[in-house]
């Protein structure tokens, strides 16, 4: 457990985004051929499209994936914590997020100031979410992963990974 949870404690993901949990599902994520590992740096331009998120688990089990930025609009003043970037529900175990249903459309990282953390949190669902049972959040700023999970009775996360991103310098022409 420690090798999975320690980077999340050091990165302040546990505490600021999720509570302490025991990982029970394997989750991998990649932007193109770049694997995401806890704390790695991903350029915003490399993350314009959703990452490929693969999960283990039994095919009959269903999962919810949430991606947020707890550092919006800036790490020194995260007044929009957490900014919601993506929600996918009803992901069958043993597949990837593209097999689920996108509840909130993916929005790539767009950090303006400082280094931002982007957190992918996976929850096991108790049952399939049917059309109309889930209402998308009214707004992306000030989303609360814990509150969403509690409201939908998702319990503690089954897997979490986070990466960092910062604003890319503008190309200068001379």
From Swiss-Prot:
Secretion signal span: none
Family: Belongs to the phosphatidylethanolamine-binding protein family.
Induction conditions: Induced by abscisic acid (ABA).
Domain of life: Eukaryota
Species whose genome carries this gene: Oryza sativa subsp. japonica
Origin organism lineage: Eukaryota, Viridiplantae, Streptophyta, Embryophyta, Tracheophyta
Function: May form complexes with phosphorylated ligands by interfering with kinases and their effectors.
SUPFAM superfamilies, A to Z: PEBP-like (SSF49777)
One Pfam family matching this protein: PBP
Name by which UniProt lists this protein: Protein MOTHER of FT and TFL1 homolog 2
């Amino acid at each position: 457990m420690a090798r999975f949870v320690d980077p999340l404690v050091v990165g302040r993901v546990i505490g600021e985004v999720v509570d302490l949990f025991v990982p029970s599902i394997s989750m991998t994520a990649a932007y193109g051929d770049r694997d995401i590992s806890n704390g790695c740096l991903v350029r915003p331009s490399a993350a314009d499209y959703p990452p490929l998120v693969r999960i283990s688990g039994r095919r009959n089990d269903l999962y919810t994936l949430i991606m947020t930025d707890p550092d919006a609009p800036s790490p020194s003043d995260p007044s929009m914590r957490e900014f919601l970037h993506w929600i996918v529900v009803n992901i069958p175990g043993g597949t990837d997020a593209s097999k689920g249903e996108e509840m909130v459309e993916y929005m790539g990282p767009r950090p303006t100031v400082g280094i931002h953390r982007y957190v992918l949190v996976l929850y096991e669902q108790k049952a399939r979410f049917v059309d109309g049972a889930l209402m998308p959040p009214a707004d992306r700023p000030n989303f609360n992963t814990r509150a969403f999970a509690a409201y939908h009775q998702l319990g503690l996360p089954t897997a979490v990974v986070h990466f960092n991103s910062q604003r890319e310098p503008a190309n200068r022409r001379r």
